[in-house]
Amino acid sequence: MRCLVVADLHYSLPQFDWLLSAAPQFDLVIFAGDALDIGSSVDFRAQIVVVKKYLAMLSGLTRVILCSGNHDLDERSAEGEKIARWVGDIRELGIACDGDDLTIGGTHFTVCPWWDGPLVKGRIEAQLRDAAAERAQRWIWVHHAPPANSPTSWGGKRYFGDVELVQWIARYQPSMVISGHVHQSPFIPDGSWFDRLGDTWVFNTGLQPGRPPVYIVLDIDEGSAFWLSAGAAQSIDLKAPLTRPATPITVAPSWLTSLDQIADPSLAKPASAAG
């Protein structure tokens, strides 16, 4: 199984367009939160409508998992906690989202919501506890915030990760945790797109502007992870101990060659010269 991982697209429509073009080459697309952008000039309700349309098209191309991030919260629950109510609507599209668990082959996925208070946090704890009771060969969590005190949550001056997540990882030891949230971690000194806590691999895609987005490819069967940004292409062996730095990709896999050939439609329509 080959998985395409993105996060923090923040309503960048060129990046969503690229995602639609790339998706058919993968068995699963994992969107680790922050599809929307609370800082955008586009009305938040309009963003939700547009992103839902993209997700509907995406779900027609391959299987999709999406968890909420802090930019995706559109309402408060009756208890006063911020929630992404719209994310629950995409379940109708066949997309696994906040609070869902699904198994594909020998891999079990747990999709965690962004939590803003004790009630949602308690639901995540119950979700993990229930999934642990029927643990599959591989267990992968999708959780927008990376763990605290990890290179994947390093912001340059301090860590921005989730302390509770560190405790959950120590307790249940999943195979992988897929996150985003801390945009700069993979690009700065002492930060990284990958880490390992005990036996658990942790990933953070990071964020870059423009098209394509920065992304990770997980080849579950081969036990490899690839990270592709505008300025780097790296891979790690998930069957080996944690080693830094990651290995530069010198021989491109066929899927990477195909992704590089995705055309940017904006380049086909150059702006008219002023005059």
Where are these regions (language model features)?
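Binuclear metal-dependent phosphoesterase catalytic core
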Residues: 103-105, 167-171, 188-275
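Active-site environment of divalent metal-dependent phosphoester hydrolases
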Residues: 10-17, 36-40, 67-78, 101, ...
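Short, conserved loop/helix-junction motifs that constitute active-site signature segments
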Residues: 23-24, 55-61, 133-135, 169-172, ...
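Active-site-proximal beta-strand elements of phosphoester/diester hydrolases
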Residues: 2-10, 106-116, 140-144, 200-207, ...
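Active-site neighborhood of phospho(di)ester-bond hydrolases with catalytic His/Asp-centered motifs
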Residues: 5-7, 29-34, 64-70, 96-98, ...
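Cap/insert and terminal regions of metallo-dependent hydrolase folds
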Residues: 36-57, 152-190
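Core catalytic region of metal-dependent phosphoesterases/phosphodiesterases
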Residues: 11-103
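Conserved catalytic scaffold of divalent metal-dependent phosphoesterases
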Residues: 72-164, 268-269
